[in-house]
From Swiss-Prot:
Protein name: Small ribosomal subunit protein uS5
Protein's gene: rps2
Keyword flag Repeat: no
Record's keyword terms, sorted: Acetylation, Ribonucleoprotein, Ribosomal protein
Low complexity biased stretches: 1-25
NCBIfam families: uS5_euk_arch (TIGR01020)
Length: 265
């Protein structure tokens, strides 16, 4: 009798509550695997940075504490991690256009991405990248935009009261047939511009400005690049307030030459 009871218990399958043991589903209905996705542009990467340039080594060692030390001596930035260390940038894709090339096998289609980065406080960059896939083009354009980040010089329309809010003087940028002109505006005017240059000026931290454009502005790539070239010219000249004599100082390479030689050994 005992053997019969044991055999019956062995034949019975274990029961479980409905839904028990299944992976929990998120709001979208798919099982949640791992943590949140990393953001675009390398914001979620946890890889350690190993600098390969002299400037990168100085930044990693903490010997260069401010990005304006780099701009002061016009040192070339060839690693985007240097920009990430000093600035908290936001990026936005302006446009993605397909481009084609005629080959023997037929037409080869690739995607061209225009990306703007900036911190809304005097730093802006523009990157252009062409790749076979959209995601590759966007990530490459973000890196190119970070490497092209420039300081934006801001000024006043009238009396020098409060914080700088507009461009210091009239500046013009040109790309292809498109020419964009930036004109200082009174405080409170806002950015009087089309959608493309307005977005770039917002990322640059300019609050009030008049703009005028001419040429084939429908070509958005030339339109945004002409605006970027105009912003670049804000630091292309010296106004009388910058004529004062400045004591010459050593570049970071000269000042920390001993540390660089130790690192190379």
């Amino acid at each position: 009798m005992a053997d019969t009871t044991t055999a019956a218990q062995a034949d019975q399958k274990p029961t479980r509550a409905f839904g028990a043991g299944r992976p929990q589903r998120g709001a979208g209905g798919a099982p949640q695997r791992g943590g949140p996705r990393p953001q675009r542009g390398g914001q979620g990467e946890t890889k350690s940075w190993t600098p390969v340039t002299k400037l990168g080594r100085l930044v990693a060692l903490g010997l260069v504490e401010n990005i304006h030390e780099i701009y002061l001596f016009s040192l070339p930035i060839k690693e985007y991690q240097i920009i990430d260390k000093f600035l908290n940038l936001k990026d936005e894709v302006m446009k993605i256009v397909p481009v084609q090339k005629q080959t023997r096998a037929g037409q080869r289609t690739r995607f061209k991405a225009f990306v703007v980065v900036g911190d809304h406080n005097g730093h802006v960059g523009l990157g252009v990248k062409c790749a076979k896939e959209v995601a590759t083009a966007i990530s490459g354009a973000i890196v190119a935009a970070k490497l092209s980040v420039i300081p934006v010089r801001r000024g006043y329309w009238g009396n020098k009261l409060g914080a700088p809010h507009t461009v210091p003087t009239k500046v013009t940028g040109k790309c292809g047939s498109v020419a964009v002109r930036l004109v200082p505006a009174p405080r409170g005017t806002g950015i009087v511009a089309a959608r493309v240059p307005k977005k770039l000026l917002q990322y640059a931290g300019v609050d009030d400005v008049y703009t005028s454009s001419r040429g084939k502005t429908r070509t958005m790539g030339n339109f945004v690049m002409a605006t970027f070239f105009a912003i670049t010219k804000t630091f292309a000249y010296l106004t009388p307030d910058l004529w004062r004599e400045v004591k010459l100082i050593k570049t970071p390479y000269q000042e920390h030459s001993a540390k660089l030689s130790e690192k190379q050994q």
